Amino acid sequence: MGSGWSSEEEERQPLLGPGLGPAPGATRRGREAAAVLPAAGPSPGRVYGRRWLVLLLFSLLAFAQGLVWNTWGPIQNSARQAYSFTGWDIALLVLWGPIGFLPCFAFMWLLDKRGLRITVLLTSFLMVLGTGLRCIPVSDLTLKKRLIHGGQILNGLAGPTVMNAAPFLSTTWFSADERATATAIASMLSYLGGACAFLVGPLVVPAPNGTAPLLTAESSRDHIKDRIETVLYAEFGVVCLIFSATLAYFPPRPPLPPSVAAASQRLSYRRSFCRLLSNLRFLMIALAYAIPLGVFAGWSGVLDLILTPVHVSQVDAGWIGFWSIVGGCVVGIAMARFADFIRGMLKLILLLLFSGATLSSTWFTLTCLNSVTHLPLTTVTLYASCILLGVFLNSSVPIFFELFVETVYPVPEGITCGVVTFLSNMFMGVLLFFVTFYHTELSWFNWCLPGSCLLSLLLILCFRESYDRLYLDVVVSV
Protein backbone atom coordinates (compact mmCIF):
# COMPACT_ATOMS: atom_id res chain seq x y z
CA MET A 1 0.00 0.00 0.00
CA GLY A 2 3.03 2.23 -0.13
CA SER A 3 4.53 2.31 3.35
CA GLY A 4 6.77 5.20 2.32
CA TRP A 5 3.80 7.55 2.71
CA SER A 6 3.90 7.38 6.52
CA SER A 7 6.48 7.46 9.27
CA GLU A 8 6.50 6.67 12.96
CA GLU A 9 5.72 10.33 13.71
CA GLU A 10 2.70 10.21 11.40
CA GLU A 11 1.21 7.17 13.09
CA ARG A 12 -0.46 7.35 16.44
CA GLN A 13 -3.00 5.63 18.62
CA PRO A 14 -6.55 7.01 18.37
CA LEU A 15 -7.82 9.00 21.33
CA LEU A 16 -10.53 6.94 22.96
CA GLY A 17 -12.58 9.33 25.06
CA PRO A 18 -12.30 8.82 28.80
CA GLY A 19 -15.12 7.23 30.70
CA LEU A 20 -17.78 7.40 27.99
CA GLY A 21 -20.66 5.06 28.64
CA PRO A 22 -23.26 3.98 26.13
CA ALA A 23 -26.51 5.81 25.58
CA PRO A 24 -29.56 4.44 27.42
CA GLY A 25 -30.58 1.13 25.96
CA ALA A 26 -27.35 0.77 24.02
CA THR A 27 -25.60 -1.78 26.26
CA ARG A 28 -27.35 -4.87 24.91
CA ARG A 29 -27.04 -3.71 21.31
CA GLY A 30 -23.40 -2.80 21.85
CA ARG A 31 -22.65 -6.32 23.10
CA GLU A 32 -24.42 -7.74 20.06
CA ALA A 33 -22.29 -5.50 17.89
CA ALA A 34 -19.18 -6.71 19.66
CA ALA A 35 -20.08 -10.25 18.66
CA VAL A 36 -19.25 -9.47 15.05
CA LEU A 37 -15.58 -8.94 15.88
CA PRO A 38 -13.19 -11.46 14.34
CA ALA A 39 -11.81 -14.02 16.71
CA ALA A 40 -8.26 -13.17 15.79
CA GLY A 41 -6.57 -10.64 13.60
CA PRO A 42 -4.30 -7.63 13.58
CA SER A 43 -4.72 -5.31 16.52
CA PRO A 44 -6.61 -2.22 15.32
CA GLY A 45 -5.80 1.29 16.43
CA ARG A 46 -3.31 2.77 13.94
CA VAL A 47 -4.00 5.76 11.74
CA TYR A 48 -1.77 6.89 8.89
CA GLY A 49 -0.83 10.31 7.60
CA ARG A 50 -1.89 9.30 4.10
CA ARG A 51 -5.51 9.30 5.28
CA TRP A 52 -5.60 13.05 4.65
CA LEU A 53 -4.50 12.53 1.04
CA VAL A 54 -7.27 9.97 0.52
CA LEU A 55 -9.78 12.37 2.09
CA LEU A 56 -8.52 15.22 -0.12
CA LEU A 57 -8.88 13.23 -3.35
CA PHE A 58 -12.36 12.03 -2.47
CA SER A 59 -13.42 15.52 -1.39
CA LEU A 60 -12.16 17.03 -4.65
CA LEU A 61 -14.13 14.44 -6.59
CA ALA A 62 -17.26 15.28 -4.61
CA PHE A 63 -16.62 19.00 -5.15
CA ALA A 64 -16.34 18.53 -8.92
CA GLN A 65 -19.51 16.43 -9.07
CA GLY A 66 -21.51 19.10 -7.26
CA LEU A 67 -20.01 21.81 -9.47
CA VAL A 68 -20.93 20.01 -12.69
CA TRP A 69 -24.43 19.12 -11.46
CA ASN A 70 -25.28 22.76 -10.67
CA THR A 71 -23.78 24.26 -13.84
CA TRP A 72 -27.02 25.34 -15.47
CA GLY A 73 -29.33 26.56 -12.72
CA PRO A 74 -27.35 29.73 -11.85
CA ILE A 75 -27.00 30.74 -15.53
CA GLN A 76 -30.43 29.65 -16.74
CA ASN A 77 -31.22 33.05 -18.32
CA SER A 78 -27.98 33.00 -20.32
CA ALA A 79 -28.45 29.35 -21.31
CA ARG A 80 -31.92 30.13 -22.64
CA GLN A 81 -30.44 32.66 -25.06
CA ALA A 82 -27.30 30.72 -26.03
CA TYR A 83 -28.86 27.27 -26.55
CA SER A 84 -32.57 28.09 -26.80
CA PHE A 85 -33.21 26.25 -23.52
CA THR A 86 -36.73 26.39 -22.09
CA GLY A 87 -37.76 26.36 -18.44
CA TRP A 88 -38.48 22.65 -18.91
CA ASP A 89 -34.89 22.09 -20.13
CA ILE A 90 -33.39 23.88 -17.11
CA ALA A 91 -35.52 21.90 -14.67
CA LEU A 92 -34.65 18.65 -16.47
CA LEU A 93 -30.91 19.40 -16.34
CA VAL A 94 -31.23 19.69 -12.56
CA LEU A 95 -33.49 16.63 -12.44
CA TRP A 96 -30.77 14.40 -13.95
CA GLY A 97 -29.03 14.57 -10.54
CA PRO A 98 -31.69 12.64 -8.60
CA ILE A 99 -32.43 10.44 -11.63
CA GLY A 100 -28.77 9.38 -11.49
CA PHE A 101 -29.53 7.79 -8.10
CA LEU A 102 -31.77 5.13 -9.65
CA PRO A 103 -28.82 2.65 -9.91
CA CYS A 104 -27.79 3.65 -6.39
CA PHE A 105 -28.10 0.10 -5.07
CA ALA A 106 -25.67 -1.17 -7.70
CA PHE A 107 -23.05 1.33 -6.51
CA MET A 108 -23.76 0.33 -2.90
CA TRP A 109 -23.12 -3.32 -3.81
CA LEU A 110 -19.90 -2.34 -5.60
CA LEU A 111 -18.70 -0.37 -2.58
CA ASP A 112 -19.55 -3.24 -0.23
CA LYS A 113 -17.96 -5.97 -2.38
CA ARG A 114 -15.09 -4.26 -4.23
CA GLY A 115 -14.13 -1.47 -1.87
CA LEU A 116 -13.48 2.23 -2.17
CA ARG A 117 -10.83 2.35 -4.90
CA ILE A 118 -12.78 0.56 -7.65
CA THR A 119 -15.94 2.52 -6.85
CA VAL A 120 -14.17 5.88 -6.87
CA LEU A 121 -12.35 5.11 -10.13
CA LEU A 122 -15.61 4.14 -11.85
CA THR A 123 -17.28 7.28 -10.51
CA SER A 124 -14.53 9.61 -11.69
CA PHE A 125 -14.46 7.90 -15.11
CA LEU A 126 -18.20 8.50 -15.52
CA MET A 127 -17.61 12.16 -14.70
CA VAL A 128 -14.84 12.38 -17.32
CA LEU A 129 -17.20 10.96 -19.94
CA GLY A 130 -20.03 13.26 -18.88
CA THR A 131 -18.05 16.50 -18.86
CA GLY A 132 -16.32 15.52 -22.10
CA LEU A 133 -19.65 14.86 -23.79
CA ARG A 134 -20.78 18.42 -23.05
CA CYS A 135 -17.64 19.82 -24.72
CA ILE A 136 -18.07 18.15 -28.12
CA PRO A 137 -18.24 21.04 -30.63
CA VAL A 138 -21.35 20.82 -32.81
CA SER A 139 -23.22 23.58 -34.61
CA ASP A 140 -26.64 21.95 -34.45
CA LEU A 141 -28.35 23.30 -31.31
CA THR A 142 -30.67 20.31 -31.04
CA LEU A 143 -27.73 17.89 -31.04
CA LYS A 144 -25.80 20.12 -28.65
CA LYS A 145 -28.67 20.10 -26.18
CA ARG A 146 -28.82 16.31 -26.36
CA LEU A 147 -25.09 16.07 -25.65
CA ILE A 148 -25.46 18.41 -22.68
CA HIS A 149 -28.33 16.34 -21.30
CA GLY A 150 -26.30 13.16 -21.82
CA GLY A 151 -23.35 14.65 -19.97
CA GLN A 152 -25.55 15.64 -17.04
CA ILE A 153 -26.95 12.09 -16.88
CA LEU A 154 -23.46 10.58 -16.64
CA ASN A 155 -22.48 13.10 -13.97
CA GLY A 156 -25.66 12.22 -12.09
CA LEU A 157 -24.59 8.57 -12.06
CA ALA A 158 -21.54 9.67 -10.04
CA GLY A 159 -23.82 11.04 -7.33
CA PRO A 160 -24.41 7.81 -5.36
CA THR A 161 -20.70 7.40 -4.60
CA VAL A 162 -19.87 10.98 -3.63
CA MET A 163 -22.97 11.23 -1.44
CA ASN A 164 -22.88 7.76 0.17
CA ALA A 165 -19.24 6.83 0.67
CA ALA A 166 -18.18 9.53 3.14
CA PRO A 167 -19.00 7.54 6.33
CA PHE A 168 -17.43 4.42 4.77
CA LEU A 169 -14.23 6.36 4.09
CA SER A 170 -14.12 7.90 7.58
CA THR A 171 -14.62 4.52 9.29
CA THR A 172 -12.02 2.84 7.07
CA TRP A 173 -9.28 5.46 7.50
CA PHE A 174 -9.99 7.56 10.62
CA SER A 175 -10.06 6.90 14.35
CA ALA A 176 -13.16 7.27 16.50
CA ASP A 177 -12.27 10.82 17.57
CA GLU A 178 -11.93 12.00 13.93
CA ARG A 179 -14.76 10.15 12.17
CA ALA A 180 -17.43 12.83 12.34
CA THR A 181 -15.00 15.48 11.12
CA ALA A 182 -13.86 13.33 8.19
CA THR A 183 -17.47 12.51 7.30
CA ALA A 184 -18.34 16.21 7.36
CA ILE A 185 -15.45 17.21 5.09
CA ALA A 186 -16.09 14.43 2.57
CA SER A 187 -19.86 14.99 2.44
CA MET A 188 -19.83 18.80 2.57
CA LEU A 189 -17.47 19.28 -0.38
CA SER A 190 -20.16 18.14 -2.82
CA TYR A 191 -22.40 20.91 -1.52
CA LEU A 192 -19.50 23.36 -1.73
CA GLY A 193 -19.06 22.45 -5.39
CA GLY A 194 -22.71 23.26 -6.00
CA ALA A 195 -22.18 26.56 -4.19
CA CYS A 196 -19.21 27.49 -6.36
CA ALA A 197 -21.41 26.96 -9.41
CA PHE A 198 -23.58 29.81 -8.09
CA LEU A 199 -20.44 31.95 -8.05
CA VAL A 200 -18.51 30.81 -11.13
CA GLY A 201 -21.43 30.70 -13.55
CA PRO A 202 -22.83 34.25 -13.13
CA LEU A 203 -19.34 35.79 -12.86
CA VAL A 204 -17.96 34.13 -16.02
CA VAL A 205 -21.14 34.05 -18.11
CA PRO A 206 -22.79 37.46 -18.72
CA ALA A 207 -26.52 37.85 -18.31
CA PRO A 208 -28.49 38.48 -21.53
CA ASN A 209 -29.60 41.98 -22.46
CA GLY A 210 -33.16 41.78 -23.71
CA THR A 211 -33.30 45.42 -24.83
CA ALA A 212 -30.34 45.29 -27.25
CA PRO A 213 -30.85 45.77 -31.02
CA LEU A 214 -31.06 42.66 -33.22
CA LEU A 215 -27.46 42.68 -34.52
CA THR A 216 -26.10 43.42 -31.08
CA ALA A 217 -28.27 40.66 -29.63
CA GLU A 218 -26.82 38.12 -32.08
CA SER A 219 -23.29 39.18 -31.13
CA SER A 220 -24.21 38.98 -27.46
CA ARG A 221 -25.63 35.49 -27.97
CA ASP A 222 -22.38 34.26 -29.53
CA HIS A 223 -20.38 35.86 -26.72
CA ILE A 224 -22.56 34.22 -24.06
CA LYS A 225 -22.21 30.86 -25.80
CA ASP A 226 -18.41 31.22 -25.89
CA ARG A 227 -18.30 31.98 -22.17
CA ILE A 228 -20.52 29.02 -21.34
CA GLU A 229 -18.24 26.75 -23.36
CA THR A 230 -15.26 28.18 -21.44
CA VAL A 231 -16.92 27.02 -18.21
CA LEU A 232 -17.62 23.58 -19.70
CA TYR A 233 -14.00 23.13 -20.87
CA ALA A 234 -12.67 24.25 -17.47
CA GLU A 235 -14.87 21.75 -15.64
CA PHE A 236 -13.76 18.99 -18.03
CA GLY A 237 -10.11 19.79 -17.30
CA VAL A 238 -10.63 19.75 -13.53
CA VAL A 239 -12.41 16.38 -13.67
CA CYS A 240 -9.63 14.89 -15.83
CA LEU A 241 -6.99 16.00 -13.31
CA ILE A 242 -8.91 14.43 -10.42
CA PHE A 243 -9.37 11.18 -12.35
CA SER A 244 -5.63 11.05 -13.10
CA ALA A 245 -4.79 11.62 -9.43
CA THR A 246 -7.15 8.90 -8.18
CA LEU A 247 -5.85 6.52 -10.83
CA ALA A 248 -2.27 7.17 -9.66
CA TYR A 249 -2.94 6.78 -5.93
CA PHE A 250 -6.13 5.89 -4.09
CA PRO A 251 -5.64 2.82 -1.84
CA PRO A 252 -8.75 0.85 -0.87
CA ARG A 253 -7.84 0.62 2.83
CA PRO A 254 -4.93 1.24 5.24
CA PRO A 255 -2.53 -1.57 6.21
CA LEU A 256 -4.08 -1.73 9.69
CA PRO A 257 -7.61 -0.68 10.71
CA PRO A 258 -7.85 2.55 12.75
CA SER A 259 -10.43 1.30 15.26
CA VAL A 260 -12.26 -1.74 16.60
CA ALA A 261 -15.34 -0.86 14.52
CA ALA A 262 -13.28 -0.70 11.33
CA ALA A 263 -11.83 -4.16 12.03
CA SER A 264 -15.15 -5.83 12.83
CA GLN A 265 -17.21 -7.94 10.46
CA ARG A 266 -20.34 -6.46 8.87
CA LEU A 267 -23.66 -7.87 7.79
CA SER A 268 -24.07 -9.21 4.28
CA TYR A 269 -25.70 -7.14 1.54
CA ARG A 270 -29.03 -8.97 1.81
CA ARG A 271 -29.13 -9.08 5.61
CA SER A 272 -28.30 -5.38 5.73
CA PHE A 273 -31.42 -4.48 3.76
CA CYS A 274 -33.55 -6.73 5.95
CA ARG A 275 -32.14 -5.06 9.06
CA LEU A 276 -32.72 -1.55 7.69
CA LEU A 277 -36.27 -2.12 6.48
CA SER A 278 -37.30 -3.77 9.75
CA ASN A 279 -35.81 -1.06 11.98
CA LEU A 280 -38.54 1.48 12.72
CA ARG A 281 -36.12 3.86 14.42
CA PHE A 282 -33.95 3.94 11.32
CA LEU A 283 -36.94 4.52 9.04
CA MET A 284 -38.04 7.39 11.26
CA ILE A 285 -34.69 9.19 11.22
CA ALA A 286 -34.21 8.39 7.52
CA LEU A 287 -37.43 10.24 6.67
CA ALA A 288 -36.36 13.10 8.94
CA TYR A 289 -33.29 13.45 6.71
CA ALA A 290 -34.69 12.60 3.29
CA ILE A 291 -37.75 14.85 3.16
CA PRO A 292 -36.27 18.27 4.09
CA LEU A 293 -32.88 17.70 2.45
CA GLY A 294 -34.53 16.47 -0.75
CA VAL A 295 -36.85 19.47 -0.83
CA PHE A 296 -33.98 21.88 -0.13
CA ALA A 297 -31.72 20.35 -2.79
CA GLY A 298 -34.42 20.69 -5.44
CA TRP A 299 -35.23 24.22 -4.26
CA SER A 300 -31.56 25.23 -4.47
CA GLY A 301 -31.25 23.85 -7.99
CA VAL A 302 -33.97 26.19 -9.29
CA LEU A 303 -33.28 29.10 -6.92
CA ASP A 304 -32.85 31.50 -9.83
CA LEU A 305 -36.30 30.57 -11.15
CA ILE A 306 -37.81 31.05 -7.69
CA LEU A 307 -36.24 34.48 -7.11
CA THR A 308 -36.91 35.87 -10.60
CA PRO A 309 -40.57 36.81 -9.81
CA VAL A 310 -39.41 38.96 -6.86
CA HIS A 311 -37.02 40.83 -9.19
CA VAL A 312 -33.76 39.31 -7.96
CA SER A 313 -31.06 39.32 -10.63
CA GLN A 314 -29.14 36.25 -11.80
CA VAL A 315 -25.97 37.50 -10.07
CA ASP A 316 -27.73 38.21 -6.75
CA ALA A 317 -29.43 34.81 -6.85
CA GLY A 318 -26.01 33.26 -7.41
CA TRP A 319 -24.51 35.03 -4.42
CA ILE A 320 -27.46 34.03 -2.21
CA GLY A 321 -27.09 30.38 -3.22
CA PHE A 322 -23.32 30.53 -2.78
CA TRP A 323 -23.29 31.94 0.74
CA SER A 324 -26.16 29.75 1.95
CA ILE A 325 -24.26 26.58 1.01
CA VAL A 326 -20.82 27.84 2.07
CA GLY A 327 -22.23 28.80 5.46
CA GLY A 328 -23.73 25.34 5.80
CA CYS A 329 -20.42 23.68 4.91
CA VAL A 330 -18.44 25.71 7.44
CA VAL A 331 -20.96 25.22 10.23
CA GLY A 332 -21.36 21.54 9.34
CA ILE A 333 -17.64 20.85 9.71
CA ALA A 334 -17.57 22.85 12.96
CA MET A 335 -20.55 20.92 14.32
CA ALA A 336 -18.95 17.61 13.36
CA ARG A 337 -15.74 18.59 15.13
CA PHE A 338 -17.80 19.48 18.19
CA ALA A 339 -19.53 16.09 17.96
CA ASP A 340 -16.11 14.39 17.92
CA PHE A 341 -15.19 16.09 21.19
CA ILE A 342 -18.60 15.81 22.90
CA ARG A 343 -19.90 12.39 21.93
CA GLY A 344 -23.46 11.18 22.27
CA MET A 345 -25.05 14.57 21.47
CA LEU A 346 -26.13 14.04 17.85
CA LYS A 347 -29.89 14.20 18.50
CA LEU A 348 -29.60 17.44 20.46
CA ILE A 349 -27.53 19.03 17.68
CA LEU A 350 -30.14 18.05 15.08
CA LEU A 351 -32.98 19.45 17.19
CA LEU A 352 -31.23 22.81 17.41
CA LEU A 353 -30.43 22.88 13.68
CA PHE A 354 -33.95 22.03 12.54
CA SER A 355 -35.55 24.50 14.92
CA GLY A 356 -33.50 27.18 13.19
CA ALA A 357 -34.29 25.75 9.74
CA THR A 358 -38.04 25.83 10.40
CA LEU A 359 -37.95 29.46 11.52
CA SER A 360 -35.70 30.69 8.69
CA SER A 361 -37.66 28.86 5.95
CA THR A 362 -40.91 30.32 7.30
CA TRP A 363 -39.34 33.79 7.28
CA PHE A 364 -38.23 33.42 3.65
CA THR A 365 -41.61 32.10 2.47
CA LEU A 366 -43.56 34.89 4.16
CA THR A 367 -41.12 37.49 2.85
CA CYS A 368 -41.73 36.37 -0.74
CA LEU A 369 -45.47 36.92 -0.08
CA ASN A 370 -44.94 40.53 1.00
CA SER A 371 -48.08 41.66 -0.82
CA VAL A 372 -50.05 39.63 1.73
CA THR A 373 -47.82 39.63 4.81
CA HIS A 374 -46.42 43.18 4.32
CA LEU A 375 -43.01 41.97 5.48
CA PRO A 376 -40.14 44.01 4.00
CA LEU A 377 -38.83 42.42 0.80
CA THR A 378 -35.24 43.62 0.57
CA THR A 379 -31.94 42.19 -0.54
CA VAL A 380 -30.86 41.99 3.10
CA THR A 381 -33.88 39.95 4.21
CA LEU A 382 -33.56 37.57 1.25
CA TYR A 383 -29.85 37.09 1.87
CA ALA A 384 -30.32 36.58 5.61
CA SER A 385 -33.22 34.11 5.40
CA CYS A 386 -31.68 32.03 2.57
CA ILE A 387 -28.23 31.92 4.15
CA LEU A 388 -29.62 30.91 7.55
CA LEU A 389 -31.72 28.20 5.91
CA GLY A 390 -28.70 26.83 4.07
CA VAL A 391 -26.57 26.94 7.20
CA PHE A 392 -29.07 25.01 9.31
CA LEU A 393 -29.96 22.36 6.71
CA ASN A 394 -26.61 21.71 5.04
CA SER A 395 -24.75 21.51 8.35
CA SER A 396 -27.09 18.72 9.48
CA VAL A 397 -25.94 16.31 6.75
CA PRO A 398 -22.78 14.90 8.42
CA ILE A 399 -24.55 14.74 11.79
CA PHE A 400 -27.34 12.69 10.20
CA PHE A 401 -24.83 10.37 8.51
CA GLU A 402 -23.07 9.61 11.79
CA LEU A 403 -26.39 9.02 13.54
CA PHE A 404 -27.54 6.63 10.78
CA VAL A 405 -24.41 4.51 11.11
CA GLU A 406 -24.59 4.47 14.92
CA THR A 407 -28.26 3.45 14.86
CA VAL A 408 -27.98 0.39 12.60
CA TYR A 409 -24.39 -0.81 13.20
CA PRO A 410 -23.08 -3.37 12.07
CA VAL A 411 -24.83 -2.63 8.76
CA PRO A 412 -22.11 -1.34 6.35
CA GLU A 413 -21.87 2.45 6.12
CA GLY A 414 -22.21 2.59 2.35
CA ILE A 415 -25.47 0.64 2.36
CA THR A 416 -26.95 2.66 5.22
CA CYS A 417 -26.20 6.04 3.68
CA GLY A 418 -27.10 4.78 0.22
CA VAL A 419 -30.65 4.03 1.34
CA VAL A 420 -31.19 7.45 2.93
CA THR A 421 -29.67 9.43 0.06
CA PHE A 422 -31.78 7.40 -2.38
CA LEU A 423 -34.86 8.44 -0.41
CA SER A 424 -33.69 12.06 -0.37
CA ASN A 425 -33.15 12.10 -4.11
CA MET A 426 -36.51 10.42 -4.62
CA PHE A 427 -38.25 13.31 -2.85
CA MET A 428 -36.09 15.78 -4.74
CA GLY A 429 -36.90 14.10 -8.04
CA VAL A 430 -40.65 14.13 -7.38
CA LEU A 431 -40.59 17.86 -6.66
CA LEU A 432 -38.46 18.67 -9.71
CA PHE A 433 -40.78 16.52 -11.81
CA PHE A 434 -43.62 18.82 -10.80
CA VAL A 435 -41.41 21.85 -11.50
CA THR A 436 -40.97 20.72 -15.11
CA PHE A 437 -44.75 21.08 -15.56
CA TYR A 438 -45.50 23.93 -13.14
CA HIS A 439 -42.44 26.14 -13.63
CA THR A 440 -44.34 29.36 -14.39
CA GLU A 441 -45.41 29.87 -10.75
CA LEU A 442 -43.27 28.43 -7.95
CA SER A 443 -44.64 29.94 -4.74
CA TRP A 444 -45.91 26.45 -3.82
CA PHE A 445 -42.29 25.25 -3.76
CA ASN A 446 -41.45 27.78 -1.02
CA TRP A 447 -44.17 26.37 1.24
CA CYS A 448 -42.66 22.89 0.94
CA LEU A 449 -39.59 24.11 2.86
CA PRO A 450 -41.12 25.05 6.26
CA GLY A 451 -43.53 22.12 6.06
CA SER A 452 -40.74 19.57 5.53
CA CYS A 453 -38.53 21.15 8.22
CA LEU A 454 -41.33 21.07 10.78
CA LEU A 455 -42.12 17.43 9.99
CA SER A 456 -38.45 16.51 10.37
CA LEU A 457 -38.25 18.35 13.69
CA LEU A 458 -41.15 16.29 15.05
CA LEU A 459 -39.60 13.03 13.83
CA ILE A 460 -36.25 13.85 15.45
CA LEU A 461 -38.00 14.76 18.69
CA CYS A 462 -39.68 11.33 18.80
CA PHE A 463 -36.50 9.45 17.81
CA ARG A 464 -34.72 7.35 20.46
CA GLU A 465 -30.98 7.53 19.82
CA SER A 466 -28.33 4.84 20.43
CA TYR A 467 -24.57 4.68 19.81
CA ASP A 468 -23.73 1.05 19.07
CA ARG A 469 -20.57 1.68 17.03
CA LEU A 470 -19.23 4.20 19.54
CA TYR A 471 -19.90 1.75 22.38
CA LEU A 472 -17.85 -0.87 20.54
CA ASP A 473 -14.91 1.48 20.02
CA VAL A 474 -14.81 3.09 23.44
CA VAL A 475 -16.07 0.45 25.90
CA VAL A 476 -15.37 -2.91 24.25
CA SER A 477 -11.87 -1.88 23.16
CA VAL A 478 -11.06 -0.79 26.72
Curated annotation (Swiss-Prot):
A motif (Di-leucine motif) lies at residues 15-16. GO terms for biological process: pyridoxine transport. Glycans are attached at N209. Keywords: Glycoprotein, Lysosome, Membrane, Transmembrane, Transmembrane helix, Transport. Gene3D superfamilies: MFS general substrate transporter like domains (1.20.1250.20). The keyword Hydrolase does not apply. Cleaved in lysosomes by cathepsin L between Leu-214 and Ala-261, generating a N-glycosylated N-terminal and a non-glycosylated C-terminal fragment. It is found in: Lysosome membrane. InterPro entries: FLVCR1-2_SLC49-like, MFS, MFS_trans_sf, SLC49A4-like. This is Solute carrier family 49 member 4. It comes from Rattus norvegicus.
